[in-house]
């Protein structure tokens, strides 16, 4: 299923996932500003909490991506809708961990965007699966 953007906010989010899936963390910087917030809605696992500004990349994404083979995980967008500055995405991610385990997880994302940047994003996933896969349970 191919998802196409209905507006510029949706296109920004699709572009974000394309770059995120590439593993090019430096290229992700163009999507954020100093007050951007990425909040995984999880508890008691690595990455929990709010990540702000370029710490999103330096202190959150870089360590998380380091748990996977280079270029993984990949995000596959299944559905997307938006209202005003909000974009909601249903997706799944696939990849391989550094120790060869297969990663497959379902996600829902809520983005708030303005002026061509991500102001805030909330990430929902099966955190129990993630904790178990990485031995955090």
Could you tell me what each predicted segment is?
Residues 2-5, 61-137:
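A beta-strand edge to alpha-helix "cap/lid" segment located at domain peripheries
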Residues 12-22, 47-50, 65-68, 90:
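Short, mixed-charge, low-aromatic patches
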Residues 5-18, 38-42, 57-63, 81-84, ...:
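Short charge-dense sequence patches
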């Amino acid at each position: 299923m191919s998802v196409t953007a209905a507006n510029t906010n949706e296109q920004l989010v699709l572009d974000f996932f394309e770059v995120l899936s590439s593993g090019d963390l430096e290229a992700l910087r163009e999507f954020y500003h100093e007050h951007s917030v990425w909040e995984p809605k999880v508890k008691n696992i690595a990455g929990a909490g709010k990540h702000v500004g370029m710490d999103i990349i330096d202190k959150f994404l870089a360590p998380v991506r380091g748990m996977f083979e280079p270029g993984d995980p990949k995000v596959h967008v299944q559905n997307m809708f938006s209202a005003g500055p909000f974009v909601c995405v249903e997706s799944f991610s696939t990849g391989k961990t550094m120790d060869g385990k297969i990663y497959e997880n379902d996600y829902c994302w809520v983005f708030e965007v303005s002026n061509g940047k991500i102001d805030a994003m909330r990430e929902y996933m099966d955190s129990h699966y993630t904790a178990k896969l990485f031995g955090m349970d």
